[in-house]
Design a protein with these regions (language model features):
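Active-site microenvironment for binding and transforming phosphate-containing groups
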Residues: 1-251
Length: 251
């Protein structure tokens, strides 16, 4: 479908469904899927129902009330949360893990780094929201550690998709943000104006590699939301209230 992005690395696994939604001017509110940003909820729900019916069918979505934390929640039952209304969303959480069939875990973003993960041996999926605060707290690495501790996942088995986000070409920050990432040589740059460019997607990738994920098991979309704001919501570029969804689930 033209209004979604999918990873090639997940395409060989027939027991999962995944997608990243895209901005679409033909849809209400340009296909925003966020209930929490103040837009008309009936139109957001219309978009959610449409994309759910056309792609996943009989699956239940679980979303979180994202707070730029490093909190991780394991979803242990099949029950929609945060999909039909925002009040039922998982509270104060930025990463979701499940092995329950029929559950789609997802994160909503408009520049932050969305990461989808899959353990094909143990049939476990996860969705991670990594802004600069979450990246500083190593939320992706902590999510994988939680899978190891809870389910005995082997990092070498884990397959990862890094969805569209603002990238090192465009993510300009002050020193108060950049100072947290100076250990990642080659993934930041000091500009002539005294600010820094920071490459959050590759910092998250480096964190996952440090725990033993194989590089060939990580697919980076290499799509910058700031550069491709016509296809993906970018808060930095347009100050939009729209958000796109990155989601994965076990059939």
């Amino acid at each position: 479908m033209e209004n979604i992005y999918q990873f090639k690395i997940f395409s060989n696994f027939k027991d999962i469904i995944h997608f990243v939604s895209k901005r679409d001017i033909s849809k209400p509110l340009e296909n925003s899927l966020a209930l929490h940003t103040g837009e008309k909820s009936s139109l957001i729900l219309e978009n959610r129902i449409d994309i759910s019916k056309s792609i996943v069918g009989d699956m239940d979505f679980v979303l979180a009330n994202q707070t730029h934390s490093s909190n991780i929640e394991i979803i242990r039952e099949r029950r929609a949360r945060g999909w039909r209304d925002k009040n039922s969303a998982v509270k104060n959480c930025d990463a979701l893990i499940t092995k329950v069939k029929g559950v789609m875990v997802g994160v909503l973003t408009a520049d932050c780094v969305p990461i989808l993960i899959f353990d094909p041996k143990l049939k476990i999926v996860g969705a991670i929201h990594a802004g600069w605060r979450g990246t500083k707290e190593k939320i992706a690495l902590k999510t994988l550690k939680r899978m190891v501790e809870e389910f005995n996942s082997n990092p070498k088995d884990i397959v990862v998709g890094v969805a569209p986000s603002i990238r090192g070409c465009c993510y300009e920050v002050d020193f108060n943000v950049a100072q947290h990432f100076l250990e990642y040589k080659g993934l930041y740059k000091l500009l002539d104006n005294g600010k820094y460019i920071v490459d959050l997607p590759n910092i998250n990738i480096r964190q996952l590699l440090s725990l033993g994920v194989e590089r060939e098991n990580i697919e980076d979309s290499n799509i910058c939301t700031y550069c491709e704001f016509n296809n993906y919501f970018s808060y930095r570029k347009t100050a939009c209230s729209g958000r796109f969804l990155s989601t994965i689930g076990i059939k």
